UniProtKB/Swiss-Prot annotation:
Pathway: Protein biosynthesis; polypeptide chain elongation
Gene: efp
Annotated function: Involved in peptide bond synthesis. Stimulates efficient translation and peptide-bond synthesis on native or reconstituted 70S ribosomes in vitro. Probably functions indirectly by altering the affinity of the ribosome for aminoacyl-tRNA, thus increasing their reactivity as acceptors for peptidyl transferase.
Name used for this protein in its record: Elongation factor P
Keywords: Cytoplasm, Elongation factor, Protein biosynthesis
Membership in a protein family: Belongs to the elongation factor P family.
GO biological process: peptide biosynthetic process
Source organism: Petrotoga mobilis (strain DSM 10674 / SJ95)
Database matches in InterPro entries: Elong-fact-P_C (IPR015365), NA-bd_OB-fold (IPR012340), Rib_uL2_dom2 (IPR014722), Transl_elong_fac_P/YeiP (IPR020599), Transl_elong_KOW-like (IPR013185), Transl_elong_P/YeiP_cen (IPR001059), Transl_elong_P/YeiP_CS (IPR013852), Transl_elongation_fac_P (IPR011768)
A Gene Ontology cellular-component term: cytoplasm
Amino acid sequence: MIDVGDLRKGDMIVYQNEMYRVIEANKHFMGRGSGLIRTRLKSVITGLIKEVSFSSGEKVEEADISFRKAQYLYNDGDHYYFMLLDTYEQYSLPAQELEDEKFYLTENLEVDLIFFNGNPVSIQLPTVVVLTVIDTEPNFKGNTVSGGGKPATLETGLKTTVPFFVERGQKIKVDTRTGDYLERA
């Protein structure tokens, strides 16, 4: 059992006898009494999103999942295909299951494939991935004074903010939890 106050984005839980992935978890505390934990849960089986409020101190069952190392191969628009590194078995996941993760997938990227009851249900990305900048504004002398950054589009379609010195064609490291630029690769 896991305390609802410890729920984070990406956690897998069992709620009302169905497995859900936590999309969002926000804590709200009132002046008196206990707080509320408002969550958005996505059913791994049906894909439906449910908003659920828990009282602080409640506990939910942690899903019995297993992780296996896999390599991302390709996608055909509807499904993303992965190969287990130990047995070379191939599995596919529907595109709607990988809403945020798809922006970090490049060919041959190693990920953890998440299994529930023997079936793949999701992936866990590495914390940092290397992506190529395909579109950004050119750098001009003197524009670093203001700090901040400029918008950039990466090879997977992810849009992020990069420092002014980053140019088109450069490889950068991106945090998969937030989508933020970390450093040049």
